[in-house]
């Protein structure tokens, strides 16, 4: 079942607990029956057959609970492993990552990209990698971990990030202490205006070059975000942030319609869920208020959106 991102309370944690509990219960029933009760049933059958002077005959019918457990255990165990350690589906319910991700996109998140974690307590079991600049990541919202957010990694640990006049500036971490990188604007190339409309305004589309990743962003032509509303880090200006070790600075691609690190700070490594790698299907939900069908019923399928996420 796909979980919504940035759309309200998430049932993912409860679903994981239910999956783990069902896997343990059905597996335990199957195991106990195989080791304890199945041999007893066969012994009774053999004794009855010997008394009648016949062979073993047919196996006795399994108890309903055992039969059900044997049938569903492999299925839910497979789902548990797939969802907890490999890939998990999510639904995009908001436009904060437009134009990269649209409302109605269903995406796959690679759960093992930044470490293998246990499905209940989310403690890291195996190190597999760290986010790179430009990755689109799903994470637990630091201010309310029951909610999953999706944003793009802009600042890595040790980086200095400045956001001024809708422009992102980055000074990468100085690794050696000599010839340290300087603060530079992230290159932007204007693409078009008018494909997306918000608040009656035609949004401007740019291509942003983060060095290893090129991706498109949207800007509102009029709306300005005051630094007064930004998260203030002690010792820095209101529009400047120094990314702490083990944390990340993230932004939405729809820059003037996204609540991200500018407003609430950094994403700890422990909050990372995984890397968004693909759109597997995309639905349109464009119903008028007078339509008799509920709003969650799709009005169309955007097959052309299926593919990798960049």
Feature annotation, model-predicted:
Residues 5-8, 12-40, 49-53, 57-65, ...:
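Soluble "head" domains of membrane/secretory-pathway proteins
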Residues 51-87:
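Internal/C-terminal transmembrane anchor helices
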Residues 95:
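Short surface loop/edge beta-strand patches of beta-sandwich-type extracellular domains
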């Amino acid at each position: 079942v796909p979980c919504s991102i940035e759309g309200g309370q998430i049932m993912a944690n409860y679903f994981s607990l239910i999956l783990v509990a069902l896997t343990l219960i059905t597996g335990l029933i199957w195991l106990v029956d195989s080791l304890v009760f199945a041999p007893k049933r066969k012994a009774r059958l053999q004794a009855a057959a010997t008394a009648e002077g016949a062979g073993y005959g047919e196996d006795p019918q399994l108890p309903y609970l055992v039969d059900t457990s044997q049938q569903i255990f492999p299925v839910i165990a497979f789902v548990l492993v797939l969802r907890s350690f490999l890939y998990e589906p999510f639904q995009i319910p908001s436009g904060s990552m437009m134009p990269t991700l649209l409302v109605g996109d269903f995406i796959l998140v690679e759960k093992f990209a930044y470490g293998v974690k246990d499905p209940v307590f989310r403690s890291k079991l195996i190190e597999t990698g760290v986010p790179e600049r430009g990755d689109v990541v799903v994470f637990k919202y630091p201010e309310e971990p029951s909610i999953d957010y999706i944003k793009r990694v802009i600042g890595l640990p040790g980086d200095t990030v400045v956001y001024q006049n809708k422009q992102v500036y980055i000074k990468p971490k100085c690794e050696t202490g000599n010839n340290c990188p300087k603060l530079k604007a992230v290159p932007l190339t204007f693409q078009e205006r008018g494909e997306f409309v918000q608040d009656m305004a035609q949004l401007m589309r740019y291509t942003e070059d983060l060095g290893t990743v090129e991706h498109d962003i949207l800007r509102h032509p009029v709306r300005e975000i005051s630094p007064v509303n930004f998260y203030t880090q002690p010792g820095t200006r209101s529009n400047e942030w120094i990314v702490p070790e083990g944390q990340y600075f993230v932004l939405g691609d729809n820059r003037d319609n996204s609540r991200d690190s500018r407003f609430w700070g950094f994403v700890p490594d422990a909050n990372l869920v995984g890397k968004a790698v693909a759109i597997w299907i995309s639905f349109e939900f464009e119903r008028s208020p007078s339509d008799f069908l509920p709003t969650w019923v799709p009005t169309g399928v955007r097959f052309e959106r299926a593919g990798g996420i960049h």
